[in-house]
Amino acid sequence: MAVSVSIVGASGYAGQEVLDRVLAHPELELLALGSDSLAGEPAAALDLRLDGQLPPFVPNTIALAAGADVVFACLPHERAASLDPPHDSILVDLSGAHRLADRALYPTWYGFEHPRPDSLAAWSYGLPELFPPAGRLIANPGCYATAALLALAPVAGFLDPRSVVVDAKSGVSGAGREPKASSHAGFVLENLAPYRVGTHQHAPEIRGALGFPVCLVPHLLPVRRGLVATCYARPTEDGLRGRLEEAYAGSAVVRLLPQGVTPELGRVQQTDAAEVALFEDRATGHAIVVCALDNLGKGAAGQAVQNANLALGLEPTLGLRLAGVPV
């Protein structure tokens, strides 16, 4: 019997990407498509290719309460923080509303007081290769946090924690579908700009997983999708590659590249895979760990479906895109 799915906030980029994977999944069946802005409209209002294939959009509250086995919440952070999880459903939240266990961090990093702070302890952080989800309430990691943690978490005990810098660059889809000046073509094209320097909300998420803070500097790339995080740190002992090999041995999603091979944006775009590589800086002896992934794939929707698969006891890669199409 198929597993029923509701998507809350299906009209945004993350929601669209989740929908695409649900439709390709052999065990999942769409029950409700939620969007407050498109409620009552046919699915073709989102994408003409969906004309006549799917149920019409309903308000997000109806999609949430539709009784689906799995709910994917693709809402802005503050709206997702107010969600009342349906009983017995697996709920995967793609926002940052439940990634931080400490309620005191939300005003500083997200700009709001958490409306349901007592519920935070019930959520598990789901980065499958490193922190498999436990329970039915799953906080899907952020895109920068995913890349940084895939690069750093396996070797965190081998690094000087005061030395870690994450230099990350992402495509404009990471800013969401709603138009804004910083994602306008006139600003983005032929440009490379750092943003939220020292204040990005994924920094405390990374700290919570690693146990120490990192200097995170995100940049906006003039591409639609994809993310590369280059992580620099002073190693305290040898054996970093062995730790990475152990972490990703047998993984169908995260590929540790051969020595000397660099991760590339083009190989991970439109996929749910990630590439990781380790280098040594000849001049300083610093370790350099690079991770490339698609911010909408492994950095959002692909990881959400992977988390749902694990929570359902299914093969983790069902419904995922694990190979790009060369051009």
Model regions: which residues?
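N-terminal Rossmann-like NAD(P) cofactor-binding subdomain of oxidoreductases
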Residues: 2-188, 193-195, 280-283, 318, ...
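Short glycine-rich or small-residue beta-strand-to-loop segments that form or flank ligand, phosphate
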Residues: 4-7, 138-139, 230-232, 289-292
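Conserved active-site and cofactor/substrate-binding residues in soluble primary-metabolism enzymes
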Residues: 13, 122, 143-150, 197-205, ...
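Alpha-helical scaffold segments in soluble metabolic enzymes
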Residues: 17, 21, 150, 154, ...
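Residues in well-ordered beta-strands of folded domains
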Residues: 34, 128, 167, 217, ...
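Contiguous C-terminal substrate-recognition/catalytic subdomains in enzyme active sites
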Residues: 182-276
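C-terminal active-site/capping subdomain that shapes the small-molecule cofactor and substrate pocket
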Residues: 232-327
